[in-house]
UniProtKB/Swiss-Prot annotation:
Belongs to the ferredoxin--NADP reductase type 2 family. It catalyses: 2 reduced [2Fe-2S]-[ferredoxin] + NADP(+) + H(+) = 2 oxidized [2Fe-2S]-[ferredoxin] + NADPH. One of its GO terms (molecular function) is NADP binding. The keyword Electron transport does not apply. Keywords: FAD, Flavoprotein, NADP, Oxidoreductase. Homodimer. This is Ferredoxin--NADP reductase 2. Gene3D superfamilies: FAD/NAD(P)-binding domain (3.50.50.60). It is an enzyme of class 1 (oxidoreductase). It holds the Pfam family Pyr_redox_2. Binds 1 FAD per subunit.
Length: 329
């Protein structure tokens, strides 16, 4: 470890809703906090899979859009300005002889006094478009994630996919894009009936059953070639952007190699949210214990327990029971 590599009090693996609230609460306990997230954006599955869906079982909200909840959590944690590392997947996690945890990602090495794993169902990556030469368009105008809808304003967009995410993104783009087309390989969409009805009544163009067979363009995609699944008829669409929503593949991945007790693809914790390795905690859907319920609301309750016990771990003089937030600001 070099002198300029800061040792954080708490490093959080996973930037979904539980991870974001964990970061806020870590700030409440005056801890230095870092979040490491494998995706290009915070919010986990809420942002990546169903940003426009309503959530009804979060305390205090009769209903709240998934992305709105994420935005509120991000705004909440900004009060303490945690360090955020995006597009980083943790490969190895080990406890050194001095008690400091060393986390090696695909980009760099991090050091921390404690670790809280809030990785949901594990690291997940998008199912990519399996066409020759697609890689050169990524991070240009071939998108697997959408972090800013406004960049599609006035542009011609094609969405590939037939599930909730594909239909949601199409409906979000419909009022701001110049033209939006959704192409699905089946006649019927797998999305919620109400969403499909809204899609059919919108100005979005629907191409079914079609599959993409070619992307045309030198530096960026300029045209998409779609082929009818049954007749093999081909059509060419002029585009400015392509969004692929073929779903995601998730797995615990390297987490299984960190020496943690794993039960049915979840990390076993005790009532302190502590794993079998002192100093490593877990919260949210990634963890399990007797009576565990996998809900966002439960993750929000587990986060303070993990943080307070982590604080007591790396600072034995700290009180486990914190002050009430109403008396702190």
């Amino acid at each position: 470890m070099t002198e300029n590599q800061k040792v954080y009090d708490i490093t959080i693996i996973g930037g979904g809703p539980t991870g974001l609230f964990t970061a806020f609460y870590g700030g409440m306990r005056q801890a230095s906090v870092k979040i490491i997230e494998s995706l290009p954006q915070l919010g986990g599955q809420l942002s990546a899979l169903y940003p426009e869906k309503y959530i009804y079982d979060v305390a205090g909200f009769p209903k709240v859009r998934a992305q709105e909840l994420v935005d509120n959590l991000k705004e909440q944690m900004k009060k303490f300005d945690p360090t955020v590392c995006l597009e980083e997947a943790v490969d190895t996690l080990e406890k050194q002889a001095d008690g400091i945890f060393k986390l090696v990602t695909n980009k760099q090495t991090h050091y921390s006094k404690s670790v809280i794993i809030t990785a949901g169902n594990g690291a997940f990556q998008p199912r990519r478009l399996e066409l020759e030469g697609t890689a050169k368009y990524e991070k240009k105008n071939l998108h697997y994630f959408v972090d800013d809808m406004n960049k599609f304003a006035g542009r011609r967009v094609v969405v590939f996919g037939g599930g909730d995410s594909a239909v949601d993104w199409t409906m979000m783009l419909e009022p701001i894009a110049d033209k939006v087309t959704i192409a699905h390989r089946r006649d019927k969409f797998r999305a919620h009936e109400h969403s499909v009805e809204s899609l059919m009544n919108s100005r979005a163009e629907v191409s079914t059953p079609y599959v993409p067979v070619e992307l045309i363009g030198d530096d960026t995609i300029e045209q998409v070639v779609l082929q009818h699944v049954k007749t093999e008829e081909k059509i060419i669409i002029d585009v400015d952007d392509v969004i692929v929503n073929y779903g995601f593949v998730s797995s615990l991945g390297p987490i299984k190699n960190w020496g943690l007790d794993i039960q049915k693809n979840s990390i076993l914790v005790n009532s302190k949210m502590e794993t079998n390795i002192p100093g490593i905690y877990a919260a949210g859907d990634i963890c399990t214990y007797e009576g565990k319920v996998k809900l966002i609301a439960c993750g929000f309750g587990e986060a303070p327990t993990a943080v307070n016990n982590a604080k007591a771990y790396f600072d034995p003089n700290a009180k486990l029971q914190p002050m009430h937030s109403s008396s702190m600001f």
